[in-house]
Amino acid sequence: MNWISNYVRPTINSLFSRREVPENLWRKCPECGTMLFHRELSDNLFVCISCDHHMAITPRQRFEALFDGGVFSEVKVPAPIADPLQFKDQKKYPERMKSAVKATGEPEAMLVAEGEIGRTPIVAAAQDFSFMGGSMGMYVGNAIIAAAERAVALKRPLILFSAAGGARMQEGILSLMQMPRTTVAVQMLKEAGLPYIVVLTHPTTGGVTASYAMLGDVQIAEPNALICFAGPRVIEQTIREKLPEGFQRAEYLLDHGMLDRVTHRMKLRDELIRITRMLLGLGPAIVGDLPAPDPAPATPEPQKAAPSAPAQDKPGAGRS
């Protein structure tokens, strides 16, 4: 009985037990509610195939889609003083930081990298909205300065992807100081004659919009991105009026001259390659090395025809 209960029964149960299915295989579009398979969503750069809604994307995922072959190297960012104000609300600031690091796997809200797009060397920086709302603190200020200094040192253009709710309240006046600091960093690029291209993604608001996010030589946005200083709800409550449809969205800003382009995420890399090379005075990008073609199926050699028999050996030969 022990052999049956200890070995046979568990073996049978394991054969017929329900397999565990990972929870993240499917994702629901927040706009239209369509259930999307994770691999299909990833291949489409996290854009809904039903309604074209652009979902949030991490800096690493963005860089893998941007750089040639997904290859890039990170630029080191100086770490600022941790919790300079000893800030505490419902949680202590260090506790919030630990939770954000654990949730995202990143040390802070911005990633800086260098690599090539269309064989054109660039420096890129991207904010991570999932890290405390992408809020601009001392680290983000240091990251933008590091990106600008690296771009100037290597004589490369800087492409920045913004996604933030504004300044980080836990750092108080020190976070607001990053507005002039990052503005000076952008000025370094302009004085060096290097292109500075900004891609505004959903959402870009507050002090980020009031500083480095709106200082690009070329301003591009993803479709339907919210781009503003104060949000529409705050404005409606202040002026007590209904705002126009699509107010502060990318398409509205494009129509009113605040943006140069609104570009679908799937077309963004090609657009950035064209604009970057144009601003650098270079010709059209050279198509990268194409993968080797699939080997053609081996065609069987034609069988050699059997040698014809001599006339005298053929049946009926010599008969009259």
UniProtKB/Swiss-Prot annotation:
Provide the catalytic activity annotation: N(6)-carboxybiotinyl-L-lysyl-[protein] + acetyl-CoA = N(6)-biotinyl-L-lysyl-[protein] + malonyl-CoA
Question: One Pfam family for this entry, by name?
Answer: Zn_ribbon_ACC
Task: Relay the cofactor remark from the entry.
Answer: Binds 1 zinc ion per subunit.
Molecular-function GO term, any one = zinc ion binding
Q: Tell me the keywords, alphabetical order.
A: ATP-binding, Cytoplasm, Fatty acid biosynthesis, Fatty acid metabolism, Lipid biosynthesis, Lipid metabolism, Metal-binding, Nucleotide-binding, Transferase, Zinc, Zinc-finger
Where do the CoA carboxyltransferase N-terminal domain residues begin and end?
Answer: 25-294
**Localization, UniProt:** Cytoplasm
Region feature (Disordered): 290-320
What top-level class of enzyme does the UniProt entry assign?
A: transferase
One GO biological process this protein is involved in is: malonyl-CoA biosynthetic process
Q: What EC number is given for this enzyme?
A: 2.1.3.15
Associated pathway: Lipid metabolism; malonyl-CoA biosynthesis; malonyl-CoA from acetyl-CoA: step 1/1
Query: Which sequence ranges does the entry mark as zinc finger (C4-type)?
Result: 29-51
Q: Which cofactor does it need?
A: Zn(2+)
* GO CC, alphabetical: acetate CoA-transferase complex
Record-annotated residues binding Zn(2+)?
A: C29, C32, C48, C51
The entry sums up its family as follows: Belongs to the AccD/PCCB family.
As for what it does, the entry says: Component of the acetyl coenzyme A carboxylase (ACC) complex. Biotin carboxylase (BC) catalyzes the carboxylation of biotin on its carrier protein (BCCP) and then the CO(2) group is transferred by the transcarboxylase to acetyl-CoA to form malonyl-CoA.
What assembly does the database describe for this protein? Answer: Acetyl-CoA carboxylase is a heterohexamer composed of biotin carboxyl carrier protein (AccB), biotin carboxylase (AccC) and two subunits each of ACCase subunit alpha (AccA) and ACCase subunit beta (AccD).
Quote the protein name from its UniProt record.
Answer: Acetyl-coenzyme A carboxylase carboxyl transferase subunit beta
Organism field: Dinoroseobacter shibae (strain DSM 16493 / NCIMB 14021 / DFL 12)
Q: What's the source species' lineage?
A: Bacteria, Pseudomonadati, Pseudomonadota, Alphaproteobacteria, Rhodobacterales
